[in-house]
Amino acid sequence: MSYISGARLVADEQVRIASTKMDGIGPKKAIQVRSRLGGNIKRKELTKYQIDQIEQMRGQDHVVHWELKRGERADIERFISISCYRGIRHQDGLPLRGQRSHTNARTSRKRIRK
C-alpha cells in the first residue's frame, strides 16, 4: 500500500486501474498513463522516475479538483450577483433545471425552512 498524490494505491494492481483512484485521472487518462510508462506494469514495479512522470501528467493537462470546485463556486456566485433565475434558485436552495418542486425536492425545502 502506497500513496501517490494523496491516493492510496494497492501494490498488486495494474497502473491503469490504480491510477483511476487518483483525483483527476479517469479511464481514458489512465490508458494514456499506461502507454507512456510502457505496457501493463503493476504499482509495485514502478520506479521513482515513473511515479514522478505520473504526477507530472496529472498536473499538466487538467484542472485539479480544488481549482475545479473554486471555479464552480465562482460561477454560482456570479449567477447570484446578476440575479438570474439560476442564481435565485441557488440562493433559495431549490432545484435549478426545471424539476418539479411542489411534491419533490423535499430535502432542499426542509433545509430552507429551518
Curated annotation (Swiss-Prot):
GO terms for cellular component: mitochondrion; small ribosomal subunit. The keyword Lipid biosynthesis does not apply. Coiled coil: none annotated. It is found in: Mitochondrion. Located at the top of the head of the small subunit, it contacts several helices of the 18S rRNA. Part of the small ribosomal subunit. HAMAP family: Ribosomal_uS13. This is Small ribosomal subunit protein uS13m. It comes from Oenothera berteroana. The lineage of its organism: Eukaryota, Viridiplantae, Streptophyta, Embryophyta, Tracheophyta.
